[in-house]
């Protein structure tokens, strides 16, 4: 059995290389817009016929390129998504889950013609703590993702799983929805809890996500640091 893994994510690429070393007979590529150094590129839109003929399974590990219908119809395609489908499907699930309180986790699912939507093969929830930021939740999601893929890989490879459709359609967030969160309106009214959730949702390592414009017209970037109190020693 020959498998194609497509990934644009450094963490997922490490997992793909691990699977390749363990199981062999796999090719690992990034999409045309990927930025992984030294990883060959594959434009699935231009190579559908070749992929369908050559591979028995296509795995998307955070691949940013949408799969054409002809590819989905021609070969089994499975996606590994860092979200708990059907909640906050699409762009940066943990960001929106910190804000709206919906579940977050990792979902392995068959790919259909909609985004993060197909029948679910396996999934695992990740808790969000009051002191979490997008970055800290995402780090745990990557650990869960690795565990879940390794646990279910044999079934994914062989197709010996039972997939189930999501109970509801859920909701979908696109890149434009994330971009709308980034600019902070200093005159916006609301609770401090709401604003804190938004700031920690936009805090992700060194990324300059949240910003406001000060009185001089200068853009000012904002991150928050949350540190839980250590439990008292007995």
UniProtKB/Swiss-Prot annotation:
(6R)-10-formyltetrahydrofolate binds at residues 65-67, 112, 116, 175. It comes from Mycobacterium tuberculosis (strain ATCC 25618 / H37Rv). Sugar N-formyltransferase that catalyzes the conversion of dTDP-4-amino-4,6-dideoxyglucose into dTDP-4-formamido-4,6-dideoxyglucose using N(10)-formyltetrahydrofolate as the carbon source. Plays a role in virulence. Has no activity on dTDP-3-amino-3,6-dideoxyglucose, dTDP-3-amino-3,6-dideoxygalactose, UDP-4-amino-4-deoxyarabinose, and GDP-4-amino-4,6-dideoxymannose. Pfam families: Formyl_trans_N, N_formyltrans_C. Keywords: Carbohydrate metabolism, Transferase. It catalyses: dTDP-4-amino-4,6-dideoxy-alpha-D-glucose + (6R)-10-formyltetrahydrofolate = dTDP-4-formamido-4,6-dideoxy-alpha-D-glucose + (6S)-5,6,7,8-tetrahydrofolate + H(+). Was identified as a high-confidence drug target. DTDP-4-amino-4,6-dideoxy-alpha-D-glucose binds at residues 9, 62-64, 90-94, 209. One of its GO terms (molecular function) is hydroxymethyl-, formyl- and related transferase activity. The active site is at 81 (proton acceptor). This is dTDP-4-amino-4,6-dideoxyglucose formyltransferase. The keyword Transferase applies. GO terms for cellular component: cytosol. One of its GO terms (biological process) is conversion of methionyl-tRNA to N-formyl-methionyl-tRNA.
């Amino acid at each position: 059995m020959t498998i194609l893994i497509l990934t644009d994510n450094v963490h997922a690429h490490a997992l793909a290389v691990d699977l390749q070393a363990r199981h062999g007979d796999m090719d690992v590529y990034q999409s045309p817009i990927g930025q992984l150094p030294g990883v060959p590129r594959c434009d699935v839109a231009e190579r559908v016929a070749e992929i369908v003929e050559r591979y028995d399974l296509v795995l998307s590990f955070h691949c940013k390129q949408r799969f054409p219908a002809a590819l989905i119809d021609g070969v089994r395609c499975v996606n590994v998504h860092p979200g708990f489908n059907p909640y906050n499907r699409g762009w940066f699930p943990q960001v929106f889950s910190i804000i709206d309180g919906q579940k977050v986790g990792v979902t392995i699912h068959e790919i259909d013609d909609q985004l993060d939507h197909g029948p679910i093969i396996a999934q695992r929830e990740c808790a969000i703590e009051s002191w979490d930021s997008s970055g800290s939740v995402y780090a745990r999601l990557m650990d869960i993702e690795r565990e879940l893929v390794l646990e279910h890989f044999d079934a994914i490879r062989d197709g010996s799983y039972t997939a189930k459709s999501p109970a509801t359609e859920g909701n979908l967030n696109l890149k434009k929805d994330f971009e709308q969160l980034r600019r902070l309106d200093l005159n916006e009214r609301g609770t401090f809890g709401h604003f804190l959730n938004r700031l920690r949702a936009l805090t992700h390592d060194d990324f300059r996500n949240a910003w406001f414009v000060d009185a001089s017209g200068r853009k000012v970037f904002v991150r928050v640091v949350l540190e839980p109190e250590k439990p008292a020693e007995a």
